Amino acid sequence: MKKQFVLLTLLVALSSSAFAQWGRPIDYSAGPGLKDAYKDYFTIGVAVNRTNVSDAAQMEIIKKQFNSVTAENAWKPGEIHPKEGEWNFGLADSIANFCRENGIKMRGHCLCWHAQFADWMFTDKKGKDVKKEVFYQRLREHIHTVVNRYKDVVYAWDVVNEAMADDNMMFRPGASPYRQSKHFQLCGDEFIAKAFEFAREADPNALLFYNDYNECDPGKRDRIYDMVKKMKDAGVPIDGIGMQGHYNIYFPDEEALDKAISRFSEIVNTIHITELDLRTNMESGGQLMFSRGEAKPQAPYIATIQEDQYNRIFKILRKHKDVIKNVTFWNLSDKDSWLGVNNHPLPFDENFKAKRSLAVIRDFDVAADNRIPKNDWVPNPMNQPGQEWPQVNSEGYARFRVEAPDAKSVIVSLGLGGRGGTVLRKDKDGVWVGTTEGPMDPGFHYYHLTIDGGTFNDPGTHNYFGSCRWESGIEIPAPDQDFYAWRKDIPHGNIQQVNFWSESTGKMQTANVYLPYGYGKLVKGKQERYPVLYLQHGWGENETSWPVQGKAGIIMDNLIADGKIKPFIVVMAYGLTNDFKFGTIGQFTAKEFETLLIDELIPVIEKQFLTKEGKWNRALAGLSMGGMETKLITLRRPEVFGYWGLLSGGQYAPDEIKDPKVVKYIFEGCGDKENPAGINKSVADLKAAGYNAEGLISEGTAHEFLTWRRCLYQMAQSLFK
C-alpha cells in the first residue's frame, strides 16, 4: 500500500532559490515602486476612485508606486457638470487634494467626450437642439471652469476623447473617419479644434492631448494620425497623443505597438499611454460592452501570458522613452477595474496584493532590451532524429517552433527563473515561435508545452522522466561539457537493468547498474571485484535519471579512461520519492527506502555482481531529495556506507555524526545560485572537527543537472581511496 507523507517543502536545506520556488509566498510589491524603477524613462500613473484616496492601505500603494494620478470618472463632464449651473466638485476635489497633499501631479481626464458627457449642452430649456455657437459657449465655460480649478495640480489634459470611428464603422465606401457623435453631427470636426483652443486659453502651460483607443489597429491608427496632423497643420494646439492602451494578452504584438508609436511620433513630441490594462480574453478597446469573465481564479497559464504581454509592452515603451513620457494604469486593482475583477487586467489583484506581473514590469533588464542572440543556432542535442527544433546557441539561448494552428496560446515551461516560461507567438506563417528572454543555465533542463492550458510534450525532443512524468528535454552548451561528452576513442562500460522483487513495497522494483569496461574479465586468473556507489535521484525522477539526464555512465567512462579513478560500479535505483507530496510541514523519514536499499537491493547487487564487501566498499550519495535520503540513512546506518555525498541535498554537521572514524569521506556540493554559504560553512566545520570533507560550488548553475554532473565528477575522484 502506498504511504503518502507531506514533504518538508522539499528541503529547507536545499537552497534559498529552490525553497522559494516550492511554495514560500513571495511579496511582489517588495522593492522599489514603479515610479522609482522608471525614473529615467517616464512617469507611472494610475486612475483612482473615491475609495482609493480614502483607504489608508490603498493610499500607501499609490504613494509608493505612482507619481501621476488620473481621476477615473470624477472629472468627466457628465459627472462634474451634470446640469447647467450645477457643479459636483466634491469627489473631484478630494482626489485633487490627495494629490496636492502628497506632491503628486495629475493628468486631467477628460474635457470633451461623446460618452459621460454633459448632454444638456446640446439642447435649450425646451429640449430643442441649440446652434453650435451656443454649444461652444457652454463648452468653453465648462473647460475654463474645470481647468482653472485644478491647474495648480494638473500637468496634462485629455482634451478630446475618442472622436475617431472604429474599424467596424468603416465598412461603407466613403464612410467618415469620425465618430458620428452629437458633437460631430452638430459641429463637424471643428469641435475638436475649439476644445483645444479653449483648453489652451485656460492653461497655456498644460500639455494638451487627443486620447483614443484601438490605436494600434492600422486603420484606426491612421485615422488618428490623419486627424491630428490636419489639426496641427491648421494651428490647433495639440501637444500629444494619448494611446489608451486597453489591450489584451494577445494583442497588440510588439510590431503593431512599435509602429503606432513611431507613426504618432512623426507629428507629436509627446505620447502618453493613458489607460493601460490587459484583458485576459481577445477583446480590446474602449467599448463599454464587453465580457466580464467567469468568477474563478486566474489560471496560471493565463497569468503567464499576461505577464509576458506586460513585459513585451514595456520593452517597447522603454525603447521609445524619448517620446513616451507617461504610462498610466486604468485603475489601482482588479477590484476597481471598469473591466470587472474576473478579467484580471491589472498588476494588483482584487485584494490589492501585487501580482508577479508587477515584478515583471518593475524588474526589467536594461541589457536584455536590446540584446540580440548570436546567430549560431544548432538543433538541441536531445532532439528526435531528423528534428531541427528546438534549437540552442553558444550563448545559452533556446528557441522553439511549434505547429498548433488552432491554438490560442503556447507556452514553453523553460525560461528565466520565476517567469512561468517562454510565451510563444504566431509568426506570419501561423507557426508558434519564440526565444528565451536570456541565456539559460548550461546543462540539461526538463520542459513541456502548455497549449491553451493543456500540458503536452514537444514532439521535437526525446522524453525524460522528471516531475513525476515524462518531460521534454533540452541541453544548453556548457563551457566544460567535455567531461560528460561521449568519446569514441576510449573503451566504454555498459548499463544493465536489474529487476528485483521488493517485499517491503509488494512490487517489482528496478535499478540501473553501471559496469565499467573490463567488468567480468579475468585478471591473473581471477575476476576482479569492485566497490559500489549507490547514487540516488531527486523528487519526481526515477532510476533512469542519473544514467540519462545525469550522464553518469559517460562521466565514469571518461574518468576511468583518463586515469583519474579506479573502476567501480554505480547502482541507480528508484528511491520511492514520488509518493511524497509537496505542501505544509510534515514528516519524511526515508525509512521505506532505507528498508528497500539495505535489506533488499544491496543483497541483490552483491549476489548478482562482482562486488567487494563491507562498508568501506560502499558509498551512498544523492541529489536533492535523494540527498535528503542519503543523509537520513547514513546517520541512522553508518555501519553500511563508508563514503557519503550530498548533492544539493543539505549538509552534515559534526555533532550529527559524532565520530570521524565512522566515515572516510564526505562530499557536499551545490550550484552557486543555491546555498553556497551553507556548503562552505559545513565543509569547514567538518574539516575542523577532523572529518575528511570536500565541497564543490558549481559555477553559474542552480538546482539542476549540470550542478550534479560536476558534483559526481569531483566526488568520484575521492571515493574508495
Predicted regions, residues:
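Non-catalytic cap/lid and distal C-terminal segments of serine-dependent acyl enzymes
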Residues: 373, 380, 386, 392-420, ...
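Glycoside hydrolase catalytic-domain groove-lining segments
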Residues: 90, 97-100, 185-211, 218-291, ...
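Acidic-and-aromatic substrate-binding clefts and catalytic sites of carbohydrate-active enzymes
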Residues: 24-26, 47-57, 77-90, 164-165, ...
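Aromatic-rich peripheral "rim/lid" segments of glycoside hydrolase catalytic domains that contact
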Residues: 27-34, 81, 149, 162-186, ...
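Bacterial Sec-dependent N-terminal signal peptides
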Residues: 1-23, 367-369
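Short, acidic/polar
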Residues: 50-65, 138-146, 220-231, 257, ...
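Boundary/entry segment of secreted carbohydrate-active catalytic domains
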Residues: 22-68, 72
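Substrate-binding cleft and catalytic face of glycoside hydrolase catalytic domains
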Residues: 64-82, 91-209, 213-215, 280-288, ...
